[in-house]
Amino acid sequence: IAMPYLFDNVVLAPCHNDFIFYDLLRYIGEVFDLHDEFFTQEFQIKLININLAAPFFIHISTAFWMSVVTAAPYVFFEIWRFVSPALYPNERKGVRKALGLGTVMFFVGVLLGYFMVYPLTLRFLSTYQLSATIENQISLNSYIDNFMMLVLCMGLAFELPLVTWLLSLLGLVHKTFLRKYRRHAVVIIVIVAAVITPTGDPFTLTVVAVPLYLLYEMSILMIKDKKADETEEIIETGER
């Protein structure tokens, strides 16, 4: 009973002209008197199914991935329960904060992917034509595959600060390294953003690139300096 409702109002919502982000773009166009097609375009697509068993398997796979997303907080909680007994009190505090932040950041990434990145990508790719004689017909499989990939990739991309912090604990990444190669990181971030959103317009590129860059800066802030780590180790050794 729930899946048809979720498909119509959540998964397939970006197909419809009244999707919240499309309404927002048109509102911005009206307020600032912008006549560019990017802000005024009316958008509506109808998906087709060309595989007999596709609806059944897509039903199962979509339910699975939605379960993965909604179960993320519980997964992080179980990870915390597993590692916490082996940690010192000050380490537990840091890991607890990191896992809490990781959960929040994952959902922020998923929401950004769902409400902004995927709708913009869908609108561009579904209306892009090699020739006027070629009619675009979007299959259900193609839609779902791209939907899941982009939304989940954005969620995972927002885990960058947590991953970087964990790598720093293992001694594989240092704050000085990230600062030194910041310019290189900016170039890589722009390239990744361009791949994720092949729309070609600067607005969409900025929407993706800016959060990714902020995540990079957050990663730097989360890593402690070597001197601070050494001081804490000396204090902990004295307390023991």
Regions inferred by a protein language model and the residue ranges of each:
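Membrane topogenic/interface segments and analogous intrinsically disordered interaction regions
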Residues: I1-R240
